[in-house]
């Protein structure tokens, strides 16, 4: 293998390295996985239950759909999918980034309000609101980013790749990262390609990789802090008496607990 020359052998080595990393991660041999920049898969999976997220100090953008031709996006967007991705996004903002009251902007699909906005995106936003998620929109993408409205939100949910990637690259051209939300492992990668043209020349800027490492460490610590108080919830201290509808407060299972002690 030569520097800057992708081959079948190098692709196979990358696949084996990733398979071994997943295996060791499942065994608990390490806590977070940071992957180096890789060449895009020419045949990526069309469906991904996880949420692809791009993050920088300025903006965080999640994608409802990925790797789809633009002509297929409208058909792929459903209320259920937006709600699912929006819920994952909200959880990640709270758990991975420790934003206690996350505000999410949902982008429109069309430059003007169309069928998808009225029949799909708006109902999805309303459903997210009923779940206690602060979701707003839909916002027209160019107006949203052009006016700087993204400053008012903790995350932006885009409908497809270019709608999120293009403004993200413009706003955060350096030191940004990409991660998968909605999976148990912490997996982060620098948000740029392998730059084969400068491979082996000692010219690459390591700051993006450094930022990916720091982000992964922060996410791991944030998850531990978020999960710790939820690991041992207090037992329910009352139950509903179905036979008469009365509520017996502080009903404890232990029969002898709270008994009046015998007189001495």
Positions of the model-derived regions?
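Anion-binding alpha/beta catalytic cores of soluble intermediary-metabolism enzymes, centered on
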Residues: 1-264
């Amino acid at each position: 293998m030569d520097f800057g020359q992708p081959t079948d052998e190098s692709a196979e080595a990358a696949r084996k390295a990733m398979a071994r990393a997943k295996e060791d991660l499942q065994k608990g041999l390490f806590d977070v996985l940071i992957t180096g920049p890789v060449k895009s898969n020419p045949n990526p999976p069309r469906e991904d239950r996880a949420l692809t997220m791009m993050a920088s100090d300025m903006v965080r953008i999640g994608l409802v759909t990925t790797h789809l031709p633009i002509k297929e996006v409208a058909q792929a967007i459903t209320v259920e999918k937006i709600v699912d991705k929006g819920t994952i996004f909200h959880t990640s903002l709270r758990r991975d980034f420790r934003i206690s009251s996350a505000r999410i902007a949902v982008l429109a699909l069309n430059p003007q309000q169309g069928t998808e906005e009225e029949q799909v995106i708006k109902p999805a936003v309303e459903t997210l609101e009923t779940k206690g998620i602060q979701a707003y929109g839909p916002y027209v993408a160019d107006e949203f980013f052009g006016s700087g409205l993204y400053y008012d939100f903790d995350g932006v949910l885009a409908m497809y790749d270019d709608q999120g990637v293009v403004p993200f690259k413009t706003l955060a051209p350096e030191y940004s990262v990409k991660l998968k939300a909605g999976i148990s492992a912490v997996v982060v990668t620098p948000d740029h390609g392998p730059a084969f043209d400068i491979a082996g020349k000692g010219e690459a800027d390591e700051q993006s990789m450094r930022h990916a490492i720091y982000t992964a460490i922060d996410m791991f610590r944030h998850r531990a802090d978020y999960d710790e108080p939820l690991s041992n919830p207090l037992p329910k201290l009352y139950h509903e008496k179905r036979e008469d509808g009365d509520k017996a407060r502080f009903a404890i299972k232990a029969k002898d607990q709270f008994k009046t002690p015998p007189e001495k």
